């Protein structure tokens, strides 16, 4: 995490909060499964200083001037987790990118997600030699998944970085 809004180089990045409970829990799970777990990380919000609302809760959007820094943040997160011997299989661009929640959330249109992937996240993964990490788009309800995926995947410059589409089963008839 980076709380310093002047740290666009992410020099103060720290996993201190994660080391309190999340990382020990993941390490226990990996140990019990002989390291045979695929772990996908999904951000719920950029730091408040990177967002239009100035807070992590209640939606808001990633500020244009922080798109490159946010893409590098993903890579820093992956690198730090791997230094903890926690290999990340993949990442999603954003948990529930169309949900304005009272908790950590950030809004992306399909076009914003597409452009972030092709212009920032994909190139940052390449720059940090992390292109083997799977990138999952959408990561939200299944009801508009196809429409949403079509927007991103119809652009070859974005699609080349995308492994697949993630979805939640929160809506509709659960027994179809």
Regions found by a protein language model. Give the residues of each.
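N-terminal catalytic cores of secreted or lumenal carbohydrate-active enzymes
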Residues: 1-89, 109, 115, 119-123
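A signal for specific C-terminal beta-sheet/loop modules enriched in small/flexible residues
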Residues: 44-46, 95-100
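Active-site neighborhood of glycoside hydrolase catalytic domains
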Residues: 68-90, 97-176
């Amino acid at each position: 995490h980076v709380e310093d809004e002047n740290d666009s180089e992410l020099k103060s990045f720290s996993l201190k909060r994660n080391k309190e409970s999340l990382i020990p829990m993941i390490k226990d799970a990996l140990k019990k499964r002989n390291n045979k777990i695929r772990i996908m990380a999904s951000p719920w919000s950029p730091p408040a200083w990177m967002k239009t609302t100035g807070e992590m809760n209640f939606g808001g959007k990633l500020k244009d001037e922080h798109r490159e820094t946010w893409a590098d943040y993903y890579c820093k997160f992956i690198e730090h987790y791997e230094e903890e011997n926690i290999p990340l299989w993949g990442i999603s661009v954003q948990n529930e990118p169309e949900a304005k929640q009272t908790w950590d959330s950030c809004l992306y249109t399909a076009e914003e997600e597409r452009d972030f992937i092709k212009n920032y996240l994909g190139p940052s993964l390449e720059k940090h030699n992390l292109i083997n990490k799977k990138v999952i788009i959408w990561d939200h309800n299944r009801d508009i998944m196809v429409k949403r995926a079509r927007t991103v995947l119809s652009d070859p410059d974005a699609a080349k970085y995308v492994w697949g589409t993630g979805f939640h089963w929160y809506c509709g008839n659960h027994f179809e």
